[in-house]
């Protein structure tokens, strides 16, 4: 995970400086579109060809939720997944979102 974090920082820095190499930005199969930092709660993205899917990430919003039969204020975030059904069926996309939800809610599981 540490190496992934270092790679992400490196790519982000070079992307902002417009110094990524062509081979580093082509050949993707999945796109993540994040408008959450602009306060957008949810949105639907259009799949970039030749990708198989795109995930839209909304802003983190505090809302009342029920935890252990009690109403508490908790951070929530909406994710939307659009899949090209020629390559990914809805059930597989749903399983992906459920797994991602579990990791976001329980990040310690990433280390197990």
Predicted regions and their residues:
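C-terminal catalytic/motor cores of large multi-domain enzyme assemblies
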Residues: 1-112
